[in-house]
């Protein structure tokens, strides 16, 4: 097949499915070139405004000209300039200067490329967190409602993926929520820990600005403070090389990778529960699970989350390696890698949160299936209760234990060797030895008596930890997610 012209046919060029297929428009824009280069121009404006306020010869007319052209970006011209200059920042300096001829002389005054590059990255990372946090809060809120609704519904617990003591559907969901609440706290901390790079010059010494202000250190410090405030940050990093420390990127991607681990665990549980036919993710009326097997109801949303969460978890390796090989004040081998991993981490996190919200808004529970599985396993779990009841009725503990051992082994053989149902209780009812407690067997086998404090734990956890954590996001809780499958 001949290679078609990509300019004539956009489908002839590879597009990342993170953007073309999955991510929200808001997160896609956050990492777009329009957002990036528009932010560069705003940073040049902030710098000029601050320099003017501190006495440099910059006119109101120059400032107004810059303000009027913040989004008037000739991307074609910028691309041509970059092709010629082999320098993206200078290409955009020239492009901005072209539409601001009066301000051309003072654009980028005293700055280095990382003034716009790194500071823009920090703004984009901050804004990315601000997009993710409400989404994560909505997922937690939906799951909290689900947990509250099913706080008392007994279900078979599993350890080692083998039947264990009973829990409740709501309590199991709270395990998911607890992990996500930790992620919420970690994302908030990572966002709030972000500082502005500020105006630091080529190697972080602020030498160019000290020269501009004729050795006035206080004005250089004030310039840094003013620009930092204009960009919406409370603090800037006190010391930098040419770039801000790449350990910051490690922190950012670490919390996102941790979120990926949480989502992967939750969606794996949902996939296993779907196999057990106890809980299913939403399944549309006309949705097709398999082209060959019409009966299939595949948990494809949860599978998508797991697939993308694995990608998200691996991305943290990039900033770890990048930070470790930055020589002295900086090397450029960070640049291409960061263009990929930072954007992909936030886009991927955005996708899995949107998908998980959609799942959590439509989880379907099948209580009768859950109850049937409990009834298959509960008789064996109830043996201790039966022994205690017999002793209270005057029986001998050792004799009772032996009787139950024999009957339970017989029942287990029916289940494992014959494929039948667990008939242990029927055997107990048929044995005259247990006649003193026959009328109490139903109460001894009530599943709710085996769930301990699970319902109370759910109520306390939701009230004291979950709901308070969601208070800052109350105004952003509306809206359901409709996925493009």
Curated annotation (Swiss-Prot):
Signal sequence segment: none
CDD domains, A to Z: Adenylsuccinate_lyase_2
Residues noted as binding substrate in the record, renumbered to the chain: 21-22, 86-88, 112-113, 242, 304, 330, 335, 339
GO CC annotation terms, alphabetical: cytosol; protein-containing complex
Pfam family, one: ADSL_C
GO BP annotation list: 'de novo' AMP biosynthetic process; 'de novo' IMP biosynthetic process; 'de novo' XMP biosynthetic process; AMP salvage; GMP biosynthetic process
Presence of keyword Metal-binding: no
GO molecular function, one term: (S)-2-(5-amino-1-(5-phospho-D-ribosyl)imidazole-4-carboxamido) succinate lyase (fumarate-forming) activity
Pathway in which this enzyme or protein is active: Purine metabolism; AMP biosynthesis via de novo pathway; AMP from IMP: step 2/2; Purine metabolism; IMP biosynthesis via de novo pathway; 5-amino-1-(5-phospho-D-ribosyl)imidazole-4-carboxamide from 5-amino-1-(5-phospho-D-ribosyl)imidazole-4-carboxylate: step 2/2
Tissues where the protein occurs: Expressed in liver.
Record's catalysed reaction(s): N(6)-(1,2-dicarboxyethyl)-AMP = fumarate + AMP; (2S)-2-[5-amino-1-(5-phospho-beta-D-ribosyl)imidazole-4-carboxamido]succinate = 5-amino-1-(5-phospho-beta-D-ribosyl)imidazole-4-carboxamide + fumarate
Matching PROSITE patterns: FUMARATE_LYASES (PS00163)
Active site residues according to the UniProt entry: 160 (proton donor/acceptor), 290 (proton donor/acceptor)
EC number: 4.3.2.2
Record's keyword terms, sorted: Lyase, Purine biosynthesis
Reported induction: Significantly increased expression by estrogen. Rapidly up-regulated within 0.5 hour after extrogen exposure with a peak at 1-4 hours and diminishing thereafter.
Subunit structure: Homotetramer. Residues from neighboring subunits contribute catalytic and substrate-binding residues to each active site.
Function field: Catalyzes two non-sequential steps in de novo AMP synthesis: converts (S)-2-(5-amino-1-(5-phospho-D-ribosyl)imidazole-4-carboxamido)succinate (SAICAR) to fumarate plus 5-amino-1-(5-phospho-D-ribosyl)imidazole-4-carboxamide, and thereby also contributes to de novo IMP synthesis, and converts succinyladenosine monophosphate (SAMP) to AMP and fumarate.
Family from the record: Belongs to the lyase 1 family. Adenylosuccinate lyase subfamily.
Annotated PANTHER family: ADENYLOSUCCINATE LYASE
Protein name (Swiss-Prot/TrEMBL): Adenylosuccinate lyase
Source organism of the structure: Gallus gallus
């Amino acid at each position: 097949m001949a290679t078609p012209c990509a300019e004539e046919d956009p489908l002839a060029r590879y597009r990342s499915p993170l953007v073309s297929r999955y991510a929200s428009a808001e997160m896609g824009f956050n990492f777009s070139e329009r957002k990036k280069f528009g932010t560069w121009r705003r940073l040049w404006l902030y710098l000029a405004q601050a320099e003017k306020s501190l006495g440099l010869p910059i006119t109101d007319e120059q400032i107004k000209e810059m303000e009027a052209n913040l989004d008037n970006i000739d991307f074609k011209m910028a691309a041509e300039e970059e092709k010629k200059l082999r320098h993206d920042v200078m290409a955009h300096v020239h492009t901005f200067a072209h539409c601001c001829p009066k301000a051309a002389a003072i654009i980028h005054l005293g700055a280095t490329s990382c003034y716009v590059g790194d500071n823009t990255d920090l703004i984009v990372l901050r804004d990315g967190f601000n997009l993710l946090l409400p989404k994560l809060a909505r997922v937690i809120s939906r799951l909290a409602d689900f947990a509250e609704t099913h706080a008392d519904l007994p279900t078979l617990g599993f350890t080692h993926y083998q039947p264990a003591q009973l829990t409740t559907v709501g309590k199991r969901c709270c395990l998911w929520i607890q992990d996500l609440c930790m992620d919420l706290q970690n994302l908030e901390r990572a966002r709030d820990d972000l500082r502005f790079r500020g105006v630091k010059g080529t190697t972080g010494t602020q030498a160019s600005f000290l020269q501009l202000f004729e050795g006035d250190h206080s004005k250089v410090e004030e310039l840094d403070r003013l620009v930092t405030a204009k960009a919406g940050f409370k603090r800037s990093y006190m010391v930098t090389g040419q770039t801000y420390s790449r350990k910051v990127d490690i922190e950012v991607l670490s919390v996102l990778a941790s979120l990926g681990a949480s989502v992967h665990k939750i969606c794996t549980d949902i996939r296993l529960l779907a196999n057990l036919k106890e809980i299913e993710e939403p399944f549309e009326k006309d949705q097709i699970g398999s082209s060959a097997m019409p009966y299939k109801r595949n948990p494809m949303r949860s599978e998508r989350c797991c697939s993308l969460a694995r990608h998200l978890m691996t991305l943290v390796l990039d900033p770890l390696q990048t930070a470790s090989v930055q020589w002295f004040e900086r090397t450029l081998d960070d640049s291409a890698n960061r263009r990929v991993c930072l954007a992909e981490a936030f886009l991927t996190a955005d996708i899995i949160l949107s998908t998980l919200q959609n799942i959590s808004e439509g989880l379907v529970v099948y209580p009768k299936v859950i109850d049937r599985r409990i009834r298959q396993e509960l008789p064996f779990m109830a043996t201790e209760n039966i022994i205690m009841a017999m002793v209270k009725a005057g029986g001998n503990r050792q004799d009772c234990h032996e009787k139950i051992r024999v009957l339970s082994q017989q029942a287990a053989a029916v289940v494992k060797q014959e494929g039948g149902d667990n008939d242990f209780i029927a055997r107990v009812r048929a044995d005259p030895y247990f006649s003193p407690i026959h009328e109490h067997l139903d109460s001894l086998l009530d599943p709710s008596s085996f769930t301990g404090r699970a319902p109370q734990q759910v109520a306390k956890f939701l009230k004291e930890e979950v709901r308070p954590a969601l208070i800052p996001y109350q105004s952003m809780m509306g809206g359901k997610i409709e996925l493009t499958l």
